[in-house]
Regions:
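Class I S-adenosyl-L-methionine-dependent methyltransferase catalytic core
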Residues: 2-286
Length: 286
């Protein structure tokens, strides 16, 4: 029987590192279902395609362009089988199975073994991202030791149009005509967390965030921004009049969490009407 890869389990995503974004599904579902049929969507920093997959699942014939910047996802896809091998060896070395002991530290002896095993990964950076969550000071306590469904991973991007563009502010006007632009840029602290040039360099991170700032200014359609609550981008979104959503289950947490800013604008179907063109020339918000 052929599997339906759109009906994935929201609690058990088939790909690593999408769990945090999928926690937004209760907020996103009514927003996605309200999008007009055939709307054009640009997912600017798609990561592991979590938001694009939710759009594909609940949208009505949406035309989704997902930007796999630097082939981030496809690098990880190529290493899923090798990551599963590493997981098997780490479990045999005494690592916890699953996320039940997510915040429990390992003994120094087991920790040393796990680090050595992880270092055998074919692409060590990709393997680290697949296995860890958190930054360098907490990463060793947070192995995600659940083998991945290789078949589901291979079909994860079916039906999506994939791009590979490193975005900067000068490119924002090129994507401004989309009905919806999804912005999920790297956090400001990301380069320091992962090390210069390993996951994403500081210059690329700054360029990505500059693209988001410009996109919020020039976009004709709606914009969804995911970022840290105290960031400059969230402050800009609030000034524009964005609706700010707290992710379910994160309110009052001590650690930094993520918010979603929803900038609601007219559908692009009306963007070229003379009245709206005149309003934009006058600098009026529409």
């Amino acid at each position: 029987m052929e599997r339906d890869y759109l009906q994935f389990d929201l609690q058990k995503p088939p790909l690593p590192f999408v769990g945090n974004k999928l926690r937004w599904w209760r907020t996103l579902r009514p927003m996605i279902e309200a999008l007009p049929r055939g709307a054009r969507v640009f997912d600017a920093f798609t990561g592991c395609f979590a938001v694009s997959k939710l759009l594909q699942r609940w949208g009505r014939d949406l035309r989704i362009v997902a930007n796999d910047c630097g082939r981030y996802y496809r690098r990880r896809l190529a290493d899923v089988a090798d990551t599963n091998r590493v997981i098997t060896e780490m479990l045999a070395a005494g690592a916890h199975n699953g996320l039940r002991h997510h915040y429990e530290r390992y003994s120094p002896e087991i920790e040393k073994k796990l680090i050595q095993i992880c270092a055998t990964g074919r692409d060590q950076i990709s393997c680290r991202i697949n296995l860890y969550c958190g930054n360098g000071s907490t990463v060793r306590a947070r192995f995600r030791l659940v083998p991945y469904d290789e078949d589901a991973c291979a079909h994860w991007i079916d039906g999506l149009e994939c791009a590979d563009v490193c975005l900067d502010a000068s490119m924002a006007t090129h994507y401004a005509r989309f009905d919806l632009v999804v912005l999920d840029p790297p956090y400001r602290r990301t380069p320091a967390s992962w090390g210069q040039g390993e996951y994403i360099g500081r210059a690329q991170c700054m360029a990505a965030r500059a693209f988001c700032a410009e996109m919020m200014r020039v976009a004709r359609g709606s914009v969804w921004l995911f970022d840290e609550p105290d960031s400059d981008l969230v402050a800009q979104a609030r000034e524009i009049g964005a609706v700010v959503h707290d992710r379910p289950g994160t309110r009052n947490r001590q650690e930094a969490h993520e918010v979603m800013c929803e900038i609601r604008r007219i559908p692009n179907a009306y963007a070229d009407f003379p009245l709206f063109a005149w309003a934009r020339q006058k600098g009026l918000a529409i």
